[in-house]
From Swiss-Prot:
Pfam family, one: Crust_neurohorm
Name the UniProt record assigns to this protein: Alpha-latrotoxin-associated low molecular weight protein-2
A single cellular component GO annotation: extracellular region
Function text: May increase the toxicity of alpha-latrotoxin and/or other venom components. Is non-toxic to mice and to the cockroach Periplaneta americana.
Annotated signal peptide: 1-19
PTM comment: The N-terminus is blocked.
GO-annotated molecular function: neuropeptide hormone activity
Sites of Pyrrolidone carboxylic acid modification: 20
Further comment found in the protein's record: Co-purifies with latroinsectotoxin.
Family matches, as InterPro entries: Crust_neurhormone_CS, Crust_neurohorm, Crust_neurohorm_sf
Disulfide bonds: 30-66, 46-62, 49-75
UniProt subcellular location: Secreted
Length: 88
């Protein structure tokens, strides 16, 4: 019985770890065949944008319609400008 519990635990942990490098395209309004690398990159842009603006709604607006809204474009622009600014 202990072996069965250990195996179930390992399977659960491995499943959680393996899923960290992929995202569900439907969560972003994307087609199922969307490139995972692009999805991860765009998701990271939205997370950075949310952190930059310190507003939780930014992430939701940024990722809407598979990153095709003006909010996403503004995030890309804002992050580029933030990189150009000298650190305080």
């Amino acid at each position: 019985m202990l072996k069965l519990i250990c195996i179930a635990f390992l399977v659960t942990v491995l499943t959680l770890v393996a899923g960290q490098d992929s995202l569900d395209p439907a969560e972003f309004g994307c087609a199922d065949d969307v490139n995972q690398a692009e999805l991860l990159k765009n998701n990271d842009i939205c997370l950075q944008c949310e952190d930059l603006h310190k507003e939780g709604v930014v992430f939701s607006l940024c990722k809407t319609n598979c990153f095709t809204t003006e909010y996403f474009q503004h995030c890309v622009k804002d992050l580029e400008e933030a990189k150009k600014e000298p650190p305080e």
